[in-house]
Amino acid sequence: MQNQNDFDVVVVGAGSAALNAALSAREQGSKVLVLEKAPEHLRGGNSYFTGGLFRFAYSGLEEIVDLLPGIGPEEQSKIDVGSYDNSDFYADVMRVTEGLSNPDILQILVSESYPTMIWMRDQGVPWILAYGRQAFEHEGKLRFWGGLIVESVGGGKGLSDRLFELCQNAGIEVRYLSAATELKTDNKGKISGVIIKGPDGYES
C-alpha cells in the first residue's frame, strides 16, 4: 500500500510559478503535492498581489492574436502591439540584473516564454490585452509599449484563484500551513524527500 506521503513531485510554495510547475508535473502523470506555508485565506504568495502582467517574447500582432483568439479584425485594426523579440527580452533582463543573470538559463526563459503563454492558456488561464496600463493613443491607434501586452483576467488575484482551481481539478493536493524545512537525501546524495512542518508538527 502506498503511503499517503508518497509523491513523485513536491512543489514548495504556491505562487504562479509553483502552481504552473505543479500543473506541468501532473500533466506528465506525476502525483504532486504543493506546500503552502500560509493559511488558505492568504494563499498565493506574491503572485496574489501583482497586477497579473506577463512579459514574453513575440514577433508581432499575429502571435498576439494566436494567444488571444477573441481579438477580432475590427479590434486588430485599432491596436499596435509592435514586437518584442527574444533579443529584446534577453537584453532587458540583463539590463535590470546588471548582467548577473545566468546566460544559458535566461536563454531558455526567453525562448520558452511564448510557448509557455500558449500552454497556460490551453490549461485554462484566461488572458486579455492590458489596455488600462500598457497602451496609449497615438495617431488613431492604441499603442502598447514596454513589452507588456497581456495580463491575466482579474490581475494577480484572478490568476492565483484560477491556478488553484486548475490544480484542484487536476487532483493536485495542496497543504496549507505547511513549510518545507529540510531536504532528505539518500546515501548517494540524491534528494529523496522533504521534511514538512505542518499544523500537527513535523512529518516527511
Locations of regions flagged by a protein language model:
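Beta1/beta-strand and adjacent pyrophosphate-binding region of the FAD-binding site
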Residues: N3-A17, L33
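Core beta-strand elements of the Rossmann-like FAD/NAD(P) dinucleotide-binding domain
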Residues: N3-F7, P199-S204
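Gly/Ala-rich phosphate-binding loop of Rossmann-like dinucleotide-binding domains
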Residues: A22, R26
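Glycine-rich FAD pyrophosphate-binding loop
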Residues: E27-T50
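Short, solvent-exposed loop/turn and secondary-structure capping segments
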Residues: R43-S47, G60, G132
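N-terminal glycine-rich dinucleotide-binding loop that anchors FAD/FMN and/or NAD(P) in oxidoreductases
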Residues: Y48-S87
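Second-shell loop/turn segments in exported
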Residues: E75-D80, D92-I108, I149
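Conserved redox-cofactor binding core of oxidoreductases
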Residues: D104-E203
